[in-house]
From Swiss-Prot:
Protein name: Guanine nucleotide-binding protein subunit beta 1
Gene source species: Saccharomyces cerevisiae (strain ATCC 204508 / S288c) (Baker's yeast)
Start-end of Low complexity biased regions: 464-477, 671-693
Taxonomic classification: Eukaryota, Fungi, Dikarya, Ascomycota, Saccharomycotina
Gene3D superfamilies: Kelch-type beta propeller
Ranges for region Disordered: 464-496, 638-706
Keywords: Cytoplasm, Kelch repeat, Phosphoprotein, Repeat
Complex formation: G proteins are composed of 3 units, alpha, beta and gamma. GPB1 interacts with the alpha subunit GPA2.
Amino acid sequence: MPQASTFGSHSLEAHPLHIQPAVHIKLSKEERSHYREQYDSLKYISNYVSVFDQALSDNIDSRIRKENEALLKKYYESRKPFTFTSFRQGSVISSSDSSTGFTERTKTYCFLNDFVSNCVNEVDPYTLKMTVRNRNTALNMENLDDERKSKDDIYDFEDNTDDECNAKCHGAFHYSSERLEILRSRSTISYFKYYKKLLTVDLRDSDVLKRHNLWMPMITRRFRFLLVSSSKPEDVRLTTPIPTFSESDLDIFKNKTCPLFINGTDCVPRSYDTFSGSSVIASIFSEYKLPSLSYHCSVELNDQLFIVGGLMACHRYDEEAPDLKDFYVDGIKNLPPPLIPELINNPSMIPNPHLYCFSLTSSRLTRPDISGYIPPPLVCTQGCKLTERHIFLYGGFEIKSETQVDDKGRYFIRKRAFLNNTGYILDTVTFNFSKIELVAPPYQFAIYNNFSPRFGHMQASISNSNNNVSNENTTTSAKGRRSISPYRQGNGDHKIDDLVGSPGSTDYLEDDAIPPVTNPRSTDSLSSKHCSTATHICSSVNTILIFGGYSQTGDDKYEAMNDMWKINIPVVSRGKRNYYKFADTVTATKIPIIDDPELWPSRRAFSACCVPDYFTKDVEPIETRLLRNLKNDFSIDLEIRPGNKPSQPLFPNIPHSRKEKKSGRDSMHISNSNNSTSEDTSSKSTRNTTSSPPTSPKHTPPLNPSKKCASIGRTIAFHGGSDGYDVCSDMWWFDFDSETWTKIDLYAKTQEESDGLVPINLCMVGHSMTTVGHKVVLIGGLRQGDVDRIYRDETLPEEVISGVPLGSGVINVVDLNTQCLQGCKLIRNDGDTKESVIMDPHVGTPHQVLAVAGTIELVKGTMTLIGGVVAGREDISSLYLRGAVLQFILPSMNLAN
């Protein structure tokens, strides 16, 4: 049966929301001088392709490009003019509800859905059945021409009246070599067997088939040199000459190669994988193709990633990218790093209005229908876990556009940013949004008592672990423990050990300090009267902390802040299955700022933060824990039973061999004492191994040998950020219970072991941060040199220095025990330490790749990267979209060592 035409089915004239052509205007030269031209659609470095995607001819790809360009023009024609006064004074909130009728948001969604509709792989069931049935034929084919001829007889395109197009389709419609390589791969055998069972259902219900569509990752052949097999390691850099390919054939498989089906999952781009062998480009199951997102927000909850906001590309593949020669943009000015103007102001990057859910356990992507007070498509919004069911979103800005068309058909687009000051709560069960207004309490002597709208801020949720709810009519008797850091003079020379107290000190609260708490008699919703007194005993509701970010002081003028706010969202009522109804207005409590640069972080935004698990576990070797568990759970009875001969030593000549029998009680006593001695020795050796390596007296950080565990999730760590174009390098830890900051210095080794550890300035902004055991993992971001080149138009220095710049790797690891940067050594010349390093041989050479605008989540040892852009540091202006999901499995062997 002929295959229905999947693409080119959108009739713009018959569109239900067809916009009348814009009135042509004439712009003066002065007005046109504010608009920039020469924008190009960004290309992909990694992307997804469906197993059942068809091999298209160059004419069909040309039709898709023209259609995307027409849709893009219609989308910008629908952008109404805006006034600054109506938005600058107040917050940008969504007034739309599920009951709202035909609104401006509906028009926007309609056009954006047309872009996304090209991302839906609408598979014809009969063609699907034919493809699976003929797979064995494709496997056994040796001649590519025979394969093409057989496919020409099976497939045909409808709704194609162009004779030339018909001729091209008849002669050029075929499977590419990469396509046949995928079909012949043994990796797809199990999937095709699985899919054959789905074909037993009613073929009229094609939605069942769509949900099981497999999308495979691929790397464009232009960057094929990045793919290095673990069996054949190669030392390649991004400076390797890039091969050129002719673009005569625009088949979506022509200039692409799939790493999953070449050398297996161990074949990954080393530019992403500094620690080779720890990253995987994951395949996904989805009805929709995952769009390439940038500056979006992703929050992990119950092993699922919820992705909202950001910008997405309006084209699926490079061959479908629209021509932007008719678009002129007056973009957002003075964008601070890491907001790249070429990405934010690009007309092919449109706001993402959808919510995507990605299951980390099943690798399944869904796009649920959302309702309620839906937030506008926000850029750089921040989200965090509120309860086991709810996610709290705040901040970011909305990009509003207005368009004027001249008599030559040129589109003059004006873009401006409007900050959001409304909080949104997402119910992950019903996918319903609710909004919350954040207000600041009035302070009599406060200078800045206004809770300003912001973006690029630090936002984290802290578990209220001390607020435990007991059984009915039973008071809590457990003692609440909290870790209180000693008040230190802020000289910046602090060890991680200083953040915790001595094991001998009992930092407990008295029993009377915690009031008795009782459970409600019913799990149904409570009255507001009861919930007002039980706001903080509805445990599971986390406290939100917000620090810094950029506020808008004028038209395209932004100022960094360093204020810190604590938000406790009141609960009006609660019900079953962790359902909560929250109040509409929340009062944010400001934490007083200490005017001391050594006790309080400076103004900054886009810093990396996380809630580390370093203090939630004993930092002791696994051998010590195993020995303790054996001692507590097992015992050996050495008492000799009557009638049995005593056992003889295997090697009696060894001095420590057993010579005589001892009673069971004495043996147990000796064994216990030996175990106790062994444990004490292990504890001492543990403290010795966690101390810093031999360092020079000048640069030796203070060492506190005592450790203890703090409360779970009560400490926040953050690093870097920037104030304008000045990138920060310091690391800070915030203790939630004492509400104090501690500055932590970072160190690195040098080529001379006698120098010990020397302090370093790891300047980074726009990166992500997480912890794996006692290792801090920093991923992506911009260095100070990158910021100077992108925003200040500085060039690379002509002098050639050995090594690579500090922080150039995609992954940077810091050991918390020694506060030392791992996997590299500083280069010193004439006693001066330059910001350049050499890598250890066992780690491998890092590739000079820049990665920014993506999100990273760590779940059960797997770090998932979604979206963003990458670029080679030699040609930092050439940005490439990351369309495939990249996963790091941590800790890898190199990271663990």
